[in-house]
Structures are given as C-alpha cells and as structure tokens.
Amino acid sequence: MQQLNPSEISEIIKQRIESLDVTAQARNEGTIVSVSDGIVRIYGLADVMYGEMIEFPGGVYGMALNLEQDSVGAVVLGSYLTLAEGMSAKCTGRILEVPVGPELLGRVVDALGNPIDGKGPINAAASDAVEKVAPGVIWRKSVDQPVQTGYKSVDAMIPVGRGQRELIIGDRQIGKTALAVDAIINQKDSGIRCVYVAIGQKQSTIANVVRKLEEAGALANTIVVAASASESAALQFLAPYAGCTMGEYFRDRGEDALIVYDDLSKQAVAYRQISLLLRRPPGREAYPGDVFYLHSRLLERASRVSEEYVEKFTNGAVKGKTGSLTALPIIETQAGDVSAFVPTNVISITDGQIFLESAMFNSGIRPAVNAGISVSRVGGAAQTKIIKKLSGGIRTALAQYRELAAFAQFASDLDEATRKQLEHGQRVTELMKQKQYAPMSIAEMSVSLYAAERGFLQDVEVAKVISFEQALIAFFKRDHADLMAKINEKGDFNDEIDAGLKAGIEKFKATQTW
C-alpha cells in the first residue's frame, strides 16, 4: 500500500486552490412566477429598465412593460410555450433593436427584422433602437416637396408632401390598401424608399401585396415588415415601430422615404390586449389610457428634417441635403363611424385624411375618395406647379355637383346654369375614376385635368369620358412626347405648355375617335 506524504497532499491542495477560477460575475437574475397568454411575471429583477430585453432559457426574449413594486410584467417576443414557472430570467442591459440599412430593401421581414421570405439571411451592417424620440422642432423643415401617389383624385385635391402624415381612413374592403400600394408602386423611379408594414393582416393578403409589388418592379425599392394575424399581440404592437426605425435610416442620411402602416386599428387592438393582460386599467372602448401616445409617438417620427440635422447625424458625411419620412397610416372604421376613439385620435395627430366611402365604392366610383371631407393640411405647399394650377376647379366642381345632385332629385325643371354645373360635375366624377395598379405620371394627369378644367369634356358623353381620356393620353404620348417629357421633368406651367396642351387636345378632338 502506497503511503502519501502529508507535504505532497498539502502541495496538491495548494495547486488546486490556485488554479480555481473564482471571478465574480454580476448578473441581475430573477425567477418566473407565472406564464399566461404571452405575459410573464418575474420576481427578483431589481434593476430592469422599462422596455429592456429580458433573456429566458432557450434563447427566448421578452420585453419589460410593467415595473411593479415586487415583480416585473414582461411580454414574450415569440412563442412562450417553452417557458414555465420557476425558470430563470436575466436582464440584458439592452433595449430592443432591429437591423437597418439598404440590405433590407427587396426583403420581407418580421417585426424583429428576421427574414421570412426564404431568400437567405440579411447581412445588415447596422441596427437601431425600435423606440426612438422624434426630431425636435428646431431640426424640422416645412413640407414643400411632393410625393406623387399616381392617383388623380389624391394628387389634384388632397396632395401629399414629403414629411407629411396623411391618414387613409374608411370601412373594410373599399380600397385603402390598394391606394397605399399604388403610392408605393409609383415611387419605383422617384428615388423615394418605401416601407410597407402589415399589422394583423391575413398571410394570403400580405403574400398578394408582395407579389403585386414584385410584378410592378417596386419590391427592390421596398422593405415589407409583416406581423400577420397569426403572430403574437406583442409582435403586432412592435411592427410599426420596427418599420419606422427602418425608414428613419434613410431619412437621417438625407434621403426620402415613405412608410405605410396597414393598419393602426389592429395595432391598437393588439396593444389593448397586452394592456388588459398586464392588468392595466381600461378606459374608453376598453383601450388603455395611453393609446393616444401609442400612435402619437409613432407618427411624430415621420417628418422632414433640415440639412443641419442630416449633417450632424452623419458627422459631416452628407451636406446640404434634407431628409424626409412620409407616413400613410391606415385606419379601418366600422360602418363609416369616424368618431370612434382610435379614428378621432389618429385624425388629430395626422396632417390630413383621405376618406374613402363605401357608398361611392359600391356605386363604381373607385378610388372612392370623398372630396368633401378629405383634406390635406400641409400638402398644398408641396403640390407640383402644373397640377396646382389645373386642379383648382376640380374640388369645387365635385362639391357643387354633390350638393346640386341631391337638390336635383326633387326639382323637375332646372335652369341652364344649374344643368351645366350638374353635367360638368358628372364628367369630373367620371374622370376621377382610375384602375388599380395603374398610377399616372404628372404629364398624364396634367392632360386629363386640362381637358376637364378648360371645358373640353362638355361635348363628350358621360359614359365615354374614360375612353376619351385613355385615347387622349395615348395620342399625347405618341404625337407630343417632348411636351410630356418636359412636364414630367419640371412640373412647371407656363404659356408655352398651356398652348401646347390646348393645341394637342383640339387636334385630337378634330382628328381622332374614342
């Protein structure tokens, strides 16, 4: 039997003690007390921040939303089925970030910026916080450059400018998404980057929008952020903020971007669900008290920023360029009720609204824009010169027509002036109709509006107004291509362009059929 020398034993113990790694690791850790409906209550997280990322076992993350005296209420980002009571939860010291940059263009991502289109990983060079403070008053510039939607009724009567927030509001299935998607398609050659955020939509609807953008050649210029109806309420609530951060990347570097939120009613519903599960007190229509702030802090981030802001943000790399983020939020109403809680909130936050009416849609007037109650509060300053000059009488003609049409139902004999106004109104209403996925250029719109404004439609039958317009535009494209190019390039209106349009339409009416 081998005998151990006591000095050897003490030497071995000494070596073991010296090689022991006893570096202390400070970690803020807590224990899950309850898990239900995507909400986790955690005990023991002392130094957690509001909105901080919390790490759970298995690579699942959550976000702290309720900081109470003895526990923290967090919402799980993704599936919570693997979590159970008694598991540990760690603070990360980070707030939620998403990837940003041109690498995301042409891709479909979820609310956390992960690709879901099967085209491989996105190697974005940068990431940014989902929740950011909007630029201050000093850094903003007034809106004076247009965003062409390609719709006659919108660009002529309710113009949208770069950096504006223009609400699209109406009942379900009356063309709200179609209008926004057409606005994105129209930007493919304008240099404006686009972000389309789908909140609580059916996956088939999102796939359809992506396919249409691809067919029109606009997907390469667009980021699609999708939080479909099958996603958790937390991701539907976060998706608009994530999309906004992706759009701000371009704004802050002196570029122009357009973001569509489709739709914010569903985001409010998702937020209501989270708030009620977190046991926050409900208010009107069971929405929490801060539902106004939910939308105001999102929409205030859409703005036009000054050259100084861009220069400061890029550390002098970009000089003399303003940046803009234009927002087109969509709100769905119930039976045309614009006085409900969320619609009134968003109307008061935005710089105007495009109101779509189901009665007009059902009677075949598409896009179903109600010119009477639609308004753009700042877009007038941004309108293209030629469109501004030619669209002056359009809104008046439509407003007078709707008033007189209601009156004419009861009157048997009408005087000549009233009859002329009615007939002109009918033709203008017909002219405002437009097919989906067929946005018009400034020149095409100008030809159309010039014909209406200068009385060239008076002898055209109401039923033939659309075919007249199509033939007229085709004629101008063929025989007056230089004039069309000049209008598209500058958007100016002068005596030369006036004479060119007049001569062209007169020649068309004398020589062509429609």
Swiss-Prot record:
InterPro entries: ATP_synth_asu-like_sf, ATP_synth_asu_C, ATP_synth_asu_C_sf, ATP_synth_F1_a_nt-bd_dom, ATP_synth_F1_asu, ATPase_a/bsu_AS, ATPase_F1/V1/A1_a/bsu_N, ATPase_F1/V1/A1_a/bsu_N_sf
Cell compartment(s), UniProt: Cell inner membrane
Binding site for ATP: G170, D171, R172, Q173, I174, G175, K176, T177
Enzyme Commission code: 7.1.2.2
GO molecular function terms noted in the UniProt entry: ADP binding; ATP binding; proton-transporting ATP synthase activity, rotational mechanism
Main localization (coarse): membrane
Key words, A-Z: ATP synthesis, ATP-binding, Cell inner membrane, Cell membrane, CF(1), Hydrogen ion transport, Ion transport, Membrane, Nucleotide-binding, Translocase, Transport
A GO cellular component entry from the record: plasma membrane
Site label Required for activity, positions: S374
EC class name: translocase
Bilayer disposition of the protein: Peripheral membrane protein
Catalytic activity: ATP + H2O + 4 H(+)(in) = ADP + phosphate + 5 H(+)(out)
Top-rank taxon: Bacteria
CDD domains, per database record: ATP-synt_F1_alpha_C, ATP-synt_F1_alpha_N, F1-ATPase_alpha_CD
Subunit organization: F-type ATPases have 2 components, CF(1) - the catalytic core - and CF(0) - the membrane proton channel. CF(1) has five subunits: alpha(3), beta(3), gamma(1), delta(1), epsilon(1). CF(0) has three main subunits: a(1), b(2) and c(9-12). The alpha and beta chains form an alternating ring which encloses part of the gamma chain. CF(1) is attached to CF(0) by a central stalk formed by the gamma and epsilon chains, while a peripheral stalk is formed by the delta and b chains.
NCBIfam families xrefs: atpA (TIGR00962), PRK13343.1 (NF009884)
HAMAP family with a match to the protein in the record: ATP_synth_alpha_bact
Family: Belongs to the ATPase alpha/beta chains family.
Name of this chain's protein: ATP synthase subunit alpha
Lineage of origin: Bacteria, Pseudomonadati, Pseudomonadota, Gammaproteobacteria, Pseudomonadales
Gene symbol of the encoding locus: atpA
